[in-house]
Amino acid sequence: GLHVAVTECARPSAIRRRAALSEAVYDGTAEVEGVVCRRVDSEADLTDAWQAGQVPLFVDEAGDSIRALRPAVVVDAILAKRNLGTRRDMAPITVALGPGFAAGRDVDAVIETMRGHNLGRIFYRGAALPNTGVPGNIGGYTGERVIHAPADGALPWVEDAAREKG
């Protein structure tokens, strides 16, 4: 198999934080579905994480570690709805999730992230559906089910119901 490493921004946001490895940025480690991710700061830490069966996570917004590690595969799972700089020359195989990428031009393959029949479909030519700007319809609600903060800032945990339940 392949060793997996994650690069992340310094202040990641996730809609479902307990289902995101990005929490390792804040907590040092994160576990999702039995996969343990550990924040690392050096190549030695990276090797230690791999030897422990963990996924190492670098805080690396510029992607410098991609050039240093020379991976066999790069997967852009930022879900920014646009390409923030991922290129086919970053690795022998490049994959991107969601809109903003064209398979064969920007990356080798694009994976559809829009709800519906094509969710998860891999495109080797062409692109995922464009971003509609409207959240998916769940129970008849779209934009109404998304809460937007009135200002920038950090929201500290008061209570974590997911951890209380175990």
Range-by-range predicted roles:
Residues 1-166:
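Well-ordered secondary-structure scaffolds
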